[in-house]
């Protein structure tokens, strides 16, 4: 397993504003883990570790929460922060079964300069996300689409996107255009 995904946590029994302030005073972040098939778990995580490693998370960032005994596969669902102070106040994690495929929308990252645009064409982006199906730990945070070979009058559809191994297209119509050059 990729150790960069692992985030250590400790369970906590005390809740409320006062307890949350005490946790933050110890350079920790109060958090909660919930999911469809699991009870709500109140935890605390090290602030510096979370800020350092996961400052630029996406909706598809998959983490492994570990207390040394139990590992939980989670997505970061929500982060409450004080922007003026630069502090994270609370994190919500959503637990999923790491052995079951899930469907998620992931970002499409366009790279390169289209030949058609260089010839005077106009690039129209119709979709910026794609629905895929994969195990949580195989889920990419984004897919890259190279625009370089796209000529004037051509388009790219969902089926043209090259997905990583173990990731399947979950769109209903794979022939829908994601971009075209006019």
From Swiss-Prot:
Organism: Borrelia turicatae (strain 91E135)
Domain of life: Bacteria
Keyword Manganese: no
Family: Belongs to the bacterial ribosomal protein bL25 family. CTC subfamily.
Signal peptide: none
Presence of the UniProt keyword Repeat in the record: no
Function: This is one of the proteins that binds to the 5S RNA in the ribosome where it forms part of the central protuberance.
Entries under SUPFAM superfamilies matching the protein: Ribosomal protein L25-like (SSF50715)
Cellular compartments per GO CC: cytosolic large ribosomal subunit
UniProt-listed GO biological process terms: translation
Name of the gene encoding the protein in the UniProt record: rplY
GO MF terms, alphabetically ordered: 5S rRNA binding; structural constituent of ribosome
InterPro entries noted in UniProt: Rbsml_bL25/Gln-tRNA_synth_N, Ribosomal_bL25/Gln-tRNA_synth, Ribosomal_bL25_b-dom, Ribosomal_bL25_C, Ribosomal_bL25_long, Ribosomal_L25_dom, Ribosomal_uL5_bac-type
Sorted UniProt keywords: Ribonucleoprotein, Ribosomal protein, RNA-binding, rRNA-binding
Disulfide bonds: none
Listed NCBIfam families: bL25_bact_ctc, PRK05618.3-1
Quaternary structure (record): Part of the 50S ribosomal subunit; part of the 5S rRNA/L5/L18/L25 subcomplex. Contacts the 5S rRNA. Binds to the 5S rRNA independently of L5 and L18.
Protein's name according to its UniProt entry: Large ribosomal subunit protein bL25
């Amino acid at each position: 397993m990729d150790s960069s995904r692992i985030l250590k946590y400790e369970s906590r029994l005390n809740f409320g504003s006062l307890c949350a302030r005490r946790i933050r005073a110890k350079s920790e972040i109060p958090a909660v883990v919930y999911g469809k098939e699991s009870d709500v778990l109140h935890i605390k995580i090290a602030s510096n570790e979370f800020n350092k490693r996961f400052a630029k998370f996406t909706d598809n960032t998959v983490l492994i929460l570990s207390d040394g005994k139990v590992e939980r596969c989670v997505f970061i669902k929500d982060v409450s922060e004080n922007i003026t102070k630069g502090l994270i106040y609370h994190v919500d994690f959503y637990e999923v079964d790491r052995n079951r495929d899930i469907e998620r929308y992931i970002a499409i990252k366009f790279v390169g300069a289209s030949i058609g645009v260089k010839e005077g064409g106009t690039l129209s982006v119709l979709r910026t996300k794609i629905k895929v199906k994969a195990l949580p730990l195989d889920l990419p945070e984004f897919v890259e689409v190279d625009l370089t070979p796209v000529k004037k009058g051509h388009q790219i559809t969902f089926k043209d996107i090259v997905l990583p191994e173990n990731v399947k297209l979950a769109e209903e119509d794979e022939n829908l255009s994601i971009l075209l050059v006019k």
